[in-house]
């Protein structure tokens, strides 16, 4: 069983994952580890705002996600801190968020087909108001979140619409929940769906 946590930056995904590690050791946690992709992008001097470079960058990300999924399915139940659904969403929608009308589906058909075979069984979309997200961001000094405002303003409207319409997505509003309560709710959700 592959589960995935979704939502905006600063919504509480990492905090919920840490809660699971402490309170649900029977669930394998699969974090996004993108250090090698970022290093390769820098080494090659790729710019995500240039079409051909963007395609090369996304090939790296898509390949990385397929590898990650293959490791996650070795466990009876894994939860992804963003799964294949995130890289699919971002690959298709980032150009729209910068006003670009790039052809993505055909240009990355093989890679998108492969990542689409890696989709989670269930997705829990953690959602909160923009005010709560900004507050969480301000109170978290452990991360820089340089892309936060762009993500909130341009990506989140697309992301909400993209995920809310999917049949395998559940939504958890976290506006009035403490970090502990979010962790508990995420654990309860996992326990319902894990086999």
For the regions a language model picked out, list residue spans one by one.
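ATP-dependent NMP and nucleoside kinases share a basic, alpha-helical "lid"
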Residues: 80-141
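P-loop (Walker A) phosphate-binding loop of NTP-binding proteins
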Residues: 8
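ATP-binding Walker
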Residues: 11
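NTP-dependent small-molecule kinase module
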Residues: 135-195
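Conserved substrate/cofactor phosphate-moiety recognition/catalytic segment
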Residues: 21-67
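Hydrophobic anchor at the beta1->P-loop junction of P-loop NTPases
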Residues: 5
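Walker A/P-loop
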Residues: 14
């Amino acid at each position: 069983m592959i589960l995935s946590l979704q939502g905006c930056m600063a919504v509480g995904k990492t905090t919920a994952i840490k809660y699971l590690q402490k309170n649900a050791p029977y669930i394998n946690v699969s974090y996004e580890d993108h250090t090698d992709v970022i290093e390769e992008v820098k080494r090659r001097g790729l710019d995500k705002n240039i079409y051909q470079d963007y395609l090369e960058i996304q090939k790296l990300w898509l390949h990385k996600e397929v590898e990650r999924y293959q490791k996650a399915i070795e466990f009876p139940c894994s939860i992804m801190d963003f799964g294949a659904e995130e890289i699919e969403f971002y690959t298709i929608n980032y150009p729209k968020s910068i006003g670009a009308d790039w052809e993505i589906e055909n240009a990355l058909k093989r890679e998108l087909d492969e990542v689409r075979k890696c989709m989670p069984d269930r997705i829990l979309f953690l959602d909160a108001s923009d005010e709560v997200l900004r507050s969480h961001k301000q109170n978290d000094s452990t991360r820089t979140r340089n892309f936060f405002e762009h993500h909130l303003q341009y990506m989140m409207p697309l992301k909400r619409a993209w995920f809310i319409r999917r049949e395998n997505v559940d939504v958890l509003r976290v506006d009035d929940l403490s970090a502990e309560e979010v962790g508990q709710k995420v654990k309860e959700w996992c326990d319902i769906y894990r086999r």
